[in-house]
Structure formats: C-alpha cells, structure tokens
From Swiss-Prot:
Residues that span the membrane, as ranges: 295-315
Basic and acidic residues bias (residue ranges): 354-368
Residues of this chain annotated as glycosylated in UniProt: 418
Membrane topology term: Single-pass type II membrane protein
InterPro entries tied to this protein: bZIP (IPR004827), bZIP_sf (IPR046347), CREB_ATF_subfamily (IPR051381)
The protein's name in its UniProt record: Cyclic AMP-responsive element-binding protein 3-like protein 4
SUPFAM superfamilies given in the database record: Leucine zipper domain
Region called Leucine-zipper, residue ranges: 258-279
UniProt keyword terms in alphabetical order: Activator, DNA-binding, Endoplasmic reticulum, Glycoprotein, Membrane, Nucleus, Signal-anchor, Transcription, Transcription regulation, Transmembrane, Transmembrane helix
Region Disordered, annotated ranges: 71-111, 339-428
Cystine residue pairs: none
The keyword Endoplasmic reticulum appears for this protein: yes
Residue spans, topological domain Cytoplasmic: 1-294
Amino acid sequence: MLLGSLFEQTEELFHSEGFPGPDHSNFPLSELQFPAEKLYEDWPVRGPMGLSEREDTDEFLQMMINPNEVYSTGPAAAESPESDSGFSDDPRPDTPPQSETSPPLPQPTPVYELVYDIGSLEERKSQSDMSSVISIQLAEDWNSAPLLIPESCIVNDLPPVCKSTPLPIRLTPADLIAVDALYPELHLTEEEKRLLSQEGVALPNNLPLTKAEERILKKVRRKIRNKQSAQDSRRRKKEYIDGLESRVAACSSQNQELHKKVVELEKHNISLITQLRKLQTLIKQTSNKAAQTSTCVLILLFSLALLVFPSYSPFRSRPSASQEDSYRPTGVISRNILNKGGFSEVADPQASDTLHRAQQREEGDPGRHVVPPANPNPEETEPVSNRARTTPEPDEQVLAEPEAAILGQKGEPPGSDNLSKTARADEM
C-alpha cells in the first residue's frame, strides 16, 4: 500500500516523458541534488519492495519531496512560485528550521512520520492543529526491512504549529442593523420545528439557506398546509352535516305536527259527511209530497192569471147609465119649415136611416132600449140644421110629431124632455 501511494504521487508530480527542461523557473531544485534526469520507467526494481539499496531510496525520496522546501523560510518559498510540489506559497516565519536526520534510538521505538502537506495559516485558524499534517507511522518491524524514507525526513516530534490569536472586532449598532438586514433571522413555528426534528434536520437561525435546506423547509411547510387544508375541509364537512341533521330534525317534528292536524281534519270531515247524509235523509222523508203539491198549485194559478188578465182591465173606464139612456137627436126642425111650400126634408139621410132602424127594432123587441150611435163628428149637425132652417121642407112637421111620440113612450130622462120642448118651440 505504501509503494502504491508513493507511485501515485509520483505520477501526479512528474510528467510521463520527464521534466520539460533544465530551466530553473520550471523546476527550482538544484542540479547538485539531482545529478541526472531519470525516468520512472528506467528505475531499477530489485527485491520484493522494489528498491534494495539505501542510496536509491534516498534519491527517490529526494526527487519526490525536498525536505529543504518543507521547512524552508521565506526566500526559499519565494523562489518557487510555480512549483508543482503542491506546497503552500505563503511564508511561514514561525516555522523552525529543518531538523537534521536523527539516528533511530533503541528505546523508545522510533516512529517514522512523513510530512506530506502543511496548510496555510487561514486553514489553520478554522481547523484543528493536526488536521493539515498527514503522517505515516511505521512500526518497529520496518527497521529490518529496507525503507523508502530518507533519514532526513524522520523526525521524533511534530513541528509546532503557531496559533493565530483572534483580533478583537468592534461592531456599531448601524453595523448590527446592516448585518441583520443582510442576514435576516429565520422564524419557524412550533409545528415546523417539530416536523424538522422528526426529519432529523437542523436549520440555521439566519438566512440565507442552502438549496437543500430550502427544499426541506418547503417540504415541511407544504405538509403543514396540506394538514391545515384537510382540517378545514373536515371542519366544513362536519358543519354541513350538523346543519343537515338539525334541518332533518326540524322537518321531522313539523311533519309529525302536520300529520296530527291531517288526522284531526279527516275525523272532522267524516263527522260533517255523516251529518250531511242525515240531513239529506230527513229532507227526503218530510218534504217530497209537499213540494209536489205546492208546485202544482202555483202552476194552476199562473195559468188562470194568464187567461183572465187580458179580459179584465180595472183601469179601463165604464160608460155611465145616464150616458147609455140619454138620446140626442141629430136633426132639429126649424121654425121656418112652414114658411116654404109646406114641405120638409130630412136634413141628414144618415139620421133618417138610424131612426128607421131604431123603429124597426122597437117593433121587434119592445122591451129593449136602443141606444143610437153617437155622432163621431158633432160639428156636422150644425150646418145641417142651418141648411134646414134656410131650406125648410113641408114634411118636417109631419116627421117630427111621430118622433116626439116615440121618445115620450120610451120614458126618456129629463134632458130628453127639454130637447123635445126646444124642438116644439122652434116649430111654433
């Protein structure tokens, strides 16, 4: 394992075809220490460990590691700015000079340490004292075997590493505010802290966070949001179900009350129907015959009224008995009848006809009183009488006498007497 690690380091430090040239800027080691350039392929391998002679091992280790540069001071480090050995270029003023090779002591057992790298002072501040030193401890059995480590590299004690004292830093309130603004504090809830502790993640108190920490924090917060949304949905569902249950209870109670009212109304309706049927039976038993007789009587009276009413008129005036018995002659004999020839003619032929018919009726029925028809136009008598007076006839006197006799026989009322008297006076 030791040879493998050493050969790997040689492959990294040296080019496969040798060094680029004898330029000291490219390879600062002196030619006195390296008399000739040797390739890795030309190295002789003898024995089981690869090298049998002590001188060859010294040359090999001197080619790999320069002990003078390991513990060199400032000028030695400044001469090799482009060194490929991997050592730090920073000066180390506190490093003690290189210790010479010490022979191995029989007691105590010597410890061989190979110093591979020493970090810079900045790395030493942040890390422990021994973190930048890699040592290989060899047991005492290696004394008998040929060693690859030169005696110049064997030291009994590790070189002391200086510790830098921290400088006091004074911050003003403005600087503190600026720092707080630049790196705000990370506020976490109790639920987030609990979930982070379950995840086994410890987040810093200040921002910013790394991508992995931000991813974990987002995951935790998403879990919390999902949990809260699930709780809200369950709460709303429970409230909705409680509201439905309350409504169902109210509707069921109202339904029971309405059912009771319906039953009561049905009972009342049945009682009313029974009462109505009883009343109908009573009316049929008592009023069937009476209703039939009354309707018949009403129909009979109405028919009689229709028959009697047209012939009976109480508002029509009846002629009086005096008007029925009175008789007014249509013609009057003038006093001038005898003055002209002794002949008289009837003034009106219609009047003579009526008188003749009246006489015939009296002869046929002496007990009946004949009423002469009334003259519809009484004004016609007046010019006839005037004509009779102007043209008297000799026969008027002869006709007037039997007419007066006829009227006297009938027993006319006193008005008729006056008329006859006036007629006689006119004749005189």
